[in-house]
A protein has these predicted regions:
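N-terminal amphipathic, basic-rich helices that act as targeting or association modules
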Residues: 12-93, 249, 253, 260-264, ...
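Cofactor-binding active-site loop characterized by glycine-rich and histidine/acidic residues
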Residues: 54-175, 336-337, 341-342, 350-351, ...
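Non-catalytic terminal/interface segments that mediate subunit docking, oligomerization
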Residues: 78, 287-394, 400-410, 507
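A glycine-rich helix N-cap at a beta->alpha junction
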Residues: 99-109, 174-186, 406-418
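Long, well-ordered, tryptophan-enriched scaffold segments
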Residues: 187-323
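Glycine-/acidic-rich phosphate or pyrophosphate-binding loops and their flanking alpha/beta elements
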Residues: 242, 269-272, 318-333, 349-355, ...
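Peripheral docking tails and interdomain loops at the edges
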Residues: 309-316, 423-425, 444-445, 563-614
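Generic long, charged, amphipathic alpha-helical segments
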Residues: 363, 520, 524-543
Length: 614
């Protein structure tokens, strides 16, 4: 990535250094708050240049975060940040400024909100579209406990496309909960005319006079049902003509906005007015990703997530790049191939495909359930849909996978990216459950290729199958540069990489590298298993009967994963050769680099040797 020149950013952050608690903001005037926003911007750019993290989204929410903490009182009032990746300013203001140097590092603070990290983090996050549900739950609990504090959800326009958001809005409108939803819309710009009008209208209709008049008028009109109905309809029609809030109003959630999300003064005035409304309401703000940093404003996607400096000279292709290359090559020769992704086209390597075959590419936004069943529908008409999805997000489409794909044995290929330990994103994004929750489903094939070349072969084989098939692959790069091939791997057949004696290591996916290193030291047989379902049962039984010790290793939870499948096979065949199952332990994972986590959880060569030698 383009490194920022941070020497000029190392300044004396006088105002920021004086902020020890969010309540300190209440002593500042608007001019001082604007100066503080500039200091935070400089601090974020300098800090993330060293640690990596989400830059553009956090530059876009500095002013909003300052306004929220100025008007409300956390942790009594609660902020629920959707996804949580845009809450860095919130972390800085709530006592974690000095910990930002450890952001996303092992034993450091999380890149998302985390309840165990601070009392100001009301609800943990990482996945999208959960904030309104959680904030509504908190608001209802406040009502039941006779607590007048405000529960606030901050959600982006992208996250609002998730169906769970609309489920929550539908419920919220049927309650009297003290819920404020802040819709952070960073996909639009405000023209001067609309902006000025919106500011005036929002300040007017969120003020006490308007609220009181509306309340008293409706109180009177309740005695005259027909007139009340007409008045309500007239009000909605008027607001629908000048404000884009009709949808929310129809759901029973009062709409205010849009306002400039970078104008601290108008944000504070509007939030102060909305604080006095004790029912579900939504404030629509307009922001710009990367605000205030030119390169990030011009290319917010590139600077959505920045990486720390790296000394690696590894020019091997990433697994996502290999997948994208295979997708384009195969689609060129097979017009039935369709690409589907739930808002992950860049991360999943589908950008080139979307350009080459726009009519065959479907980014369905944050809608994993829909993506899965959409693919199923296409498959019934003879198409060959490929769903590119992160392992952690496939969890959201699990019912659809079973009910709509597997039970009907539909021909859908799932390219499961970011499988295994993903590193700095931590527990919310760890793809360590897919082998366990997929292998129990009938009618499916599950492959775990060990390299980019093996991955290409696996995808070729998957494309030729007729039924549901999963190809899982990790985040990062393979150790093989050349990967294009017309070869396929035989379904259900493993590959012996190294022959040894007495000890055998069954390696799944990218665990082949540490297994080969350990195998060389132990003089052990090393098998690239390739498949989790179906297993190469004949090979496993033969290996088990001719060795004294067995080891399985996978970057999935050890509970119910690939090792468990081998153990079940041994039990069914009454084979008593001892098996050690190495996998992610049964606990919530931490964040850190992939190599740090492999070492922490015993998924490295040193630990394999230790187990094999014991």
């Amino acid at each position: 990535m383009l490194r920022f020149k941070t020497a000029s950013l190392i300044i004396y952050l006088k105002m920021l250094n004086d902020i020890q608690h969010p309540s300190d903001l209440k002593n500042l005037n608007i001019e001082e708050l604007n100066s503080l926003a500039e200091e935070i911007k400089l601090f974020l750019v300098d800090s993330l240049d060293k640690t990596g993290g989400h830059l553009s989204s956090n530059l876009g929410t500095i002013e909003l975060t300052l306004a929220l903490h100025y008007v409300f009182d956390t942790p009594n009032d609660t902020f629920v940040w959707d996804v949580g990746h845009q809450a860095y300013t919130h972390k800085i203001l709530t006592g974690r400024k000095e910990l930002m140097s450890s952001l996303r590092q092992k034993d450091g603070i999380s890149g998302f909100t985390k309840r165990s990290e601070s009392e100001h983090d009301a609800f943990g996050a990482g996945h999208s579209s959960t904030s309104i549900s959680a904030a509504l739950g908190i608001a209802i609990a406040n009502k039941l406990q006779q607590n007048s504090n405000t529960s606030i959800a901050v959600i982006g326009d992208g996250a609002l496309t998730g169906g769970m958001s609309f489920e929550a809005l539908n419920h919220a409108g049927d309650t009297d909960a003290n819920l404020l939803i802040v819709l952070n819309d960073n996909d639009m710009s405000i023209s001067k005319n609309v902006g000025a009008l919106s500011k005036y209208l929002t300040r007017l209709i969120s003020g006490k006079i308007y609220s009181t008049m509306k309340s008293k008028s409706l109180e009177f009109l309740e005695r005259l049902p027909r007139i009340q109905k007409f008045a309500k309809r007239s009000e909605e029609h008027l607001k629908g003509m000048i404000l884009p809030g009709t949808l929310f109003e129809e759901l029973g959630v009062d709409y205010f906005g849009p306002v400039d999300g970078h104008d601290i003064s108008i944000l504070i005035k509007t939030l102060q007015n909305l604080k006095n409304i004790d029912k579900p309401r939504i404030l629509h703000i307009m922001t710009k990703k990367g605000h205030g940093v030119e390169v990030a404003e011009q290319n917010p996607l590139k600077y959505h997530g920045v990486s720390p400096p790296s000394s690696s000279n590894n020019n091997f292709p990433s697994y996502s790049k290999v997948f994208g290359d295979w997708l384009c090559n195969t689609a060129t020769n097979d017009e039935r191939l369709i690409g589907i992704t739930p808002a992950m086209s860049e991360g999943s390597g589908m950008v080139e495909f979307s350009t080459m075959f726009p009519e065959r590419f479907f980014d369905v936004a944050i809608a994993e359930q829909h993506a899965v069943t959409l693919a199923g529908g296409m498959a019934t008409k003879g198409l060959k849909p490929v769903v590119a999805i992160y392992s952690t997000f496939l969890q959201r489409g699990y019912d659809q996978f079973i009910h709509d794909i597997a039970l009907q044995n539909l021909n859908v290929l799932f390219a499961i990216d970011r499988a295994g330990l993903v590193g700095a994103d931590g527990a919310t994004h760890a793809g360590i459950f897919d082998l366990s929750f997929l292998r129990c489903i009938p009618n499916i094939v599950i492959m775990a290729p060990s390299s980019s070349l093996e991955m290409y072969k696996a995808l070729n084989a998957a494309h030729n199958l007729n039924g549901p098939v999963c190809v899982r692959f990790p985040r990062g790069k393979s150790h093989i540069e050349e990967f294009k091939t017309d070869e396929v791997i035989e379904i259900g057949k493993a590959n012996i990489i190294r022959k040894g004696k007495d000890i055998a290591i069954f390696a799944f996916g990218n665990m082949i590298e540490p297994s080969i290193k350990a195998g060389n030291e132990l003089d052990a047989t090393v098998i690239d298993m390739r498949f989790i379902k179906p297993l190469d049962e004949d090979l496993i039984i033969n290996i088990a009967n001719t060795n004294k010790k067995l080891i399985s290793i996978e970057d999935n939870t050890a509970t119910g994963g690939a090792g468990s499948a081998i153990n079940e096979l041994l039990q069914r065949n009454k084979i008593r050769t001892p098996l050690s199952i190495l996998g992610v332990p049964d606990r919530i994972t931490e964040h850190g680099s992939q190599n740090e986590l492999y070492e922490l959880y015993g998924l490295d060569a040193m630990h394999i040797v230790k187990v094999g030698s014991s």
